[in-house]
Regions:
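N-terminal Rossmann-like FAD-binding beta1-loop-alpha1 element of flavoenzymes
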Residues: 11-38
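Glycine-rich FAD pyrophosphate-binding loop
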Residues: 31-51
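A conserved short coil-to-beta-strand element within the FAD-binding core of flavoproteins
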Residues: 177-182, 186, 204, 225-242
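Rossmann-like flavin
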Residues: 95-214
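C-terminal catalytic lobe of FAD-dependent flavoproteins
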Residues: 302, 346-421
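Active-site substrate-recognition segment that forms the wall
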Residues: 52-55, 60, 64-104, 234-242, ...
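Residue-level detector of alpha-helix initiation sites
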Residues: 19-20, 43, 263, 388
Length: 421
């Protein structure tokens, strides 16, 4: 643990953002006896939490900026059919983010970021177990089979190389290599185009919307307040307390505040010295009837498409990454891009029966590491920027941040995640 100036534990806390990271932070603050109020501009799980794939897969939680991202080329990045899409428009802030992102797409920087993520990944599932023991009612489920499907063995090789790099960073990764026939025996929904696969062990998944709602219920049951529909315009540090001011003039006060408002984090965090940009990396999803779809979590790596069972009769199909403003309207071409990418791999699926089409702004950082810890003010803290891994790493991040707030000591795992880096 890294010592900080001795602090008096707060009695009250305001958490801005009712997604996974915000609610997990609130829950773990309650564990320490802190009275919490959570506020959200819309509602529980309204940002990046509700419609994502729901994978709790530490083996796959790697830095988003990777060397392969630079090989896509400008023409591909500007195509709405591409897995990674950048809508062409004048946006100086996005341009600065992309420049910084590209500088982190090197093997050395990827290894540095992976070394920071590995200790978090090792503890991620244990944080979920703690929430379950504490009364969060929605379960997590074992991912078996958890398949990563490819068209050829050659296409699989870079993914296997990445798994070995994750292992080299100090993280346990357990997997088997399957032939196409073995993968199709395991998961009959896969098409003949599946020529190779990786079967991961020790992973989990959940229904993210249901889980985050259950986490909000658990916070309420412990006496916490969850205020929906309050758009926070600014946070003020008054020395002895923090004030959260809403667009309607609401003024809510507490001893400390936690900024966990996802892709909108910079608007509130910048006055407290947080310079690292948090960029919306929007993902898309929809739900299909389960017939003709995988029975277990399945990822088509080249297509960047994920399938996740939601109970016995529905499957979520999710994918894509789109760097754009978080409040921009969803682009229907991106939903079609998911359909077009998935259809050849899943011949039995009826994509005309889509429901619950969704777009969510995942909060991404240029170096691929979240922002978790104190700001320039000892009363204002940050928990965000997890990119694609907010569901997997949100509970652990909330636990470590809550411990830091209450004790004044930060765990070593938080050092590379410092919001003022």
């Amino acid at each position: 643990m890294t010592p900080r100036k001795t602090v008096v534990p707060p009695r009250t806390a305001l958490v801005i953002g009712a997604g996974m990271t915000g609610l997990a932070t609130a829950w773990f603050l309650q564990e320490a006896g802190v009275e919490v109020t959570v506020v959200d501009r819309r509602q529980v799980a309204a940002g990046a939490s509700w419609g994502n794939a729901g994978w709790l897969s530490p083996a796959l939680a790697v830095p988003l900026p990777e060397p392969g991202a630079l090989r896509l080329g400008l023409r591909t990045l500007l195509s709405p059919a591409s897995p990674l899409y950048i809508p062409p428009r004048a946006d100086p802030r996005l341009a600065r983010f992309l420049l910084s992102f590209s500088r982190n797409c090197t093997p050395r920087r990827w290894q540095v970021a992976m070394s920071a993520l590995a200790p978090l990944n090792r503890q991620a599932l244990a944080a979920y177990d703690e929430l379950a023991r504490g009364g969060v009612a929605e379960p997590t489920r074992a991912s078996y089979p958890c398949l990563i499907a490819f068209t050829t063995e050659a296409a699989r090789q870079p993914f296997v190389h990445e798994l070995e790099a994750v292992r080299a960073a100090g993280q346990s990764v357990d997997y088997d290599l399957l032939s196409g026939a073995e993968a199709r025996d395991q998961e009959p929904a896969l098409s003949e185009r599946t020529g190779a696969a990786v079967r991961l062990h020790g992973q989990r998944f959940l229904n993210p919307g249901a889980y985050v709602a259950a986490l909000a219920d658990a916070v309420r049951e412990r006496g916490g307040k969850v205020v929906e529909g309050l758009r926070v315009t600014r946070v003020q540090d008054h020395g002895s307390e923090v004030a959260v001011v809403g667009s309607d003039g609401t003024d809510v006060r507490a001893d400390v505040a936690v900024l966990a408002n996802g892709a909108w984090l910079n608007r509130l965090a910048a006055p407290f010295g947080v310079r690292a940009a948090v960029q919306s990396g929007r993902g898309y999803s929809f739900t299909l009837p389960a017939e003709g779809l995988p029975t277990g979590p399945t990822y088509f790596a080249a297509q960047r498409v994920v399938c996740t069972p939601l109970g016995a009769d529905r499957v979520r199909v999710a994918g894509m990454m789109e760097f754009t403003a978080p409040d921009r309207p969803a682009d229907p071409r991106r939903v079609q891009a998911v359909v077009d990418a998935a259809r050849p791999m899943l011949p039995g699926a009826d994509f005309s029966r889509r429901s619950d089409e969704w777009a969510g702004p995942r909060p991404c950082t240029a170096d691929g590491l979240p922002l978790v810890g104190p700001t320039r003010s000892p009363r204002v803290h940050v928990c965000g920027g997890h990119g694609m891994w907010g569901i997997a790493l949100g509970p652990l991040s909330g636990k470590l941040l809550a411990e830091s707030i209450v004790t004044g000591r930060s765990a070593a795992e938080l050092t590379p995640l410092h919001p003022l880096r």
